[in-house]
Amino acid sequence: MANSQVLSTDQISFFKESGYLILENCIEPDLLATWQEQFWWCLNSSFDDPDSWPTDQTFIGRWRFTPPCPNISAVPMVQAAADQLSGGNFIGGGGAPIIKWPDSGGQWSLPRSSHIDGYGPPSQHPEGGLVLGATTNLHDVESKGGCFVYWPGSHLSTYDYLVRHPEQINGSFLDNEGWNYTEFSKGATEGPTEFHAPAGTVILWHGFMCHNGSPNVNTTPRIGIFGRWHYKKLEEMRYDILDDLWKHWGI
C-alpha cells in the first residue's frame, strides 16, 4: 500500500486548504488491539482498572511497538498517505505516547494558546523542519477527554507571517518581545477544534498548523500516539519555501 494513491483529489484539496485531514478506520482492529495490549503491559496496568493507572507518567520516551508496525508511520494507510503527500521528500514519523489521565473534578475549557512543533529544543525537534504530523488515540476519545486541539487553516496564517518576516523562519520569532503564538493562530479559518474520535482514527496535520493539548475531565485516559516527519534535506529545504509553501511536497 505504501506506493498506492490512497488520498483522493478532494482530500488533498481539503488538506491544503484546512491544514488537516481525518482518516477514519485507518488502523485495523487487530493491530489496534495489539498496540493496546503492549501499551498497558508496559505500564503494568489495565485500561479497565483505574486504581492501577500510573498517573504520574504522562510520556513514554523512545517508545516502539512490536514490528511490523513499531510506530504510527508504519501503519500502511498512514505510510501511503504520507508518501503521497510528501512525494518522497519527508522522513521520520516515529513518536511516543502522550497520556492525558482523567481529572473528572477539574475545570474544562478549550486552550487559548497554541504552538507549532519544530522550534523547541534541538533534542526534541529538528528546528524549523517539521512538515507533517499524525495523531491517533489508542482508545475512543470523546469531547473534553484530553483531546488534541488544532486551529484549522492556521498553517496558512503561519506561512503568511513567515513570508512577511522571512528572517524569522529560523525560529527567531520566539525571541520577539512579548511573543505569542496568536500571531500565527489569529488568521485561522476556525477556532480551536477538538480531535475526538473512535480509536484507530488518524488525523494528519500540517507542520505549520497551530495546536495544543486540552484537559481531560472525562473518566478514561487519552492515550495519544504521535508521529512527525521532517524534510529529508533539512538544512536546504526548511528555508526554501517562502515562494511556495508546497514546494517540497508531492501535491
Would you name each region that the model predicts?
Residues 2-17, 24-124, 248-250:
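Non-heme Fe(II)-dependent double-stranded beta-helix
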Residues 32-33, 101, 143-144, 159, ...:
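Short catalytic/ligand-binding loop motif for oxyanion handling, primarily in non-cytosolic enzymes
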Residues 100-102, 151-158, 228-234:
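Short edge-strand/loop segments of extracellular domains
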Residues 116-118, 136-140, 152:
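Short, structured patches in soluble enzyme cores that scaffold and shape functional sites
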Residues 123-143, 196-199, 204, 228-231:
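Short, conserved beta-strand element in jelly-roll/cupin
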Residues 141-210:
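Double-stranded beta-helix
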